[in-house]
Amino acid sequence: LISLILSLIVLGACIIGVAYSNTKNNARMFIDEYEKSAYAFHENELKNIMDIMKQTAESIYKTQKAKGISDEKIQEAILDKFNDLRFFDDKEGYIFVYKYDGTSVLFPTNKTQEGKNLIAVKDSNGVFLIKELIEAAKKGGGLVKYHFPKTKDGKPFPKFSYALSFEPYNWMMGTGIYVDNVEEEVAHLQKILMKIDR
C-alpha cells in the first residue's frame, strides 16, 4: 500500500511538472508568435503605404507628362504631394525620397539634409541605412531594419522602413515606423515569463 501511495505521489509530481513545463513552453511560444506577428503587421502596413505612394507618383507623372509638362515641374508636383503627408497615430511617419546615388531629394522632418549625399550614413549598429534602402528598392521593394533618432541629435530607436523605386527619375521612395513599442511589450512579457520560471 505504501509503495502504491509513493507511486501515485511520484506520478502526480510528474504530471504537475509536465503541465508546468508546458505552461512555460506555451508562454515562450506565445511571445515568439506575438513578436513575429507584430513585426509582420508593421511590414505589411509600410508596404501598403508605399504601394499607394508609388501609384500616386505614377499617376502625377503620366498625367502631367501627357500635357507636356517638364520633368522638373513634375518632380516638384510629386514632392509637394508627399511633403506634408504624415502617418500613424504619432504622426511620425513620412515619405522620404533619395536619388540612387544617395542624394536626399525629400526629407520632410529635416530640410537641411535635402540636397546632401547621405549614402555613407550609418546607424548606431553600423547599418548603411540609405545604401540598403536603395538596394532594396532596386530589387523591387523591401524592408530595412535599423536605428534612428526620433528627434534631431536624440537617442536612436529601432525602426523599420520600406522602400520602392520610382524608375522615371531613379528615385528610392520610402517610409518608416519606429518599433520600440514592440520591443518594450516583448520585454514586458519576458519579465512575466521569468516570474513563472521562479
Give residue spans per PLM region.
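Extracellular/periplasmic ligand-binding regions of membrane signal-transduction receptors
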Residues: 28, 36, 40-80, 110-116, ...
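Amphipathic coiled-coil signal-relay and dimerization helices
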Residues: 103-109, 156
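Extracytoplasmic/periplasmic sensor domains and loops in membrane signaling proteins
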Residues: 68-81, 110-151
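Extreme N-terminal signal-anchor transmembrane helix of membrane signaling/transducer proteins, especially
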Residues: 1-26, 198
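Extracytoplasmic
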Residues: 127-196
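Amphipathic alpha-helical segments and their boundaries
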Residues: 19-45, 192-197
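Short N-terminal helix-loop-first-beta-strand/juxtamembrane motif that initiates sensory/input modules
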Residues: 44, 83-104, 141-143, 194-198
